[in-house]
Amino acid sequence: MPDRKELLDRARAMRREQTPAERRLWGLLRGGQLGGLKFRRQVPLGDYIADFVCFYPRVIVECDGGQHAESAYDAARDAWFRAEGFQVLRYWNADVLEHPHETAEAILRAVGRGP
């Protein structure tokens, strides 16, 4: 279980070293561009760090690479996020990179703000 300072330092490092998919999605989410939703990136929550968080509505968006295909860690993490009242949306890195606008539309639909 990481201490708070360690978690904050790790989140800062992750913001500096985003994956290409995270960078692409952040370009669509930042500054309320997506339906006025206010997202933050690499946010410590409990013992975890969420890729993107919008506190209203309570939604977490995760960009996943191949290492997430069958991760028990991700399942436990998602369960914790859900227990805290968050909706968890996961998208494959390849989908974010190849279809960024469709991914953004899917996020809007999931939170009830899309067509």
Residue ranges, per PLM feature:
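Residue-level detector of family-conserved "landmark" positions at structurally sensitive sites
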Residues: 39-42, 91
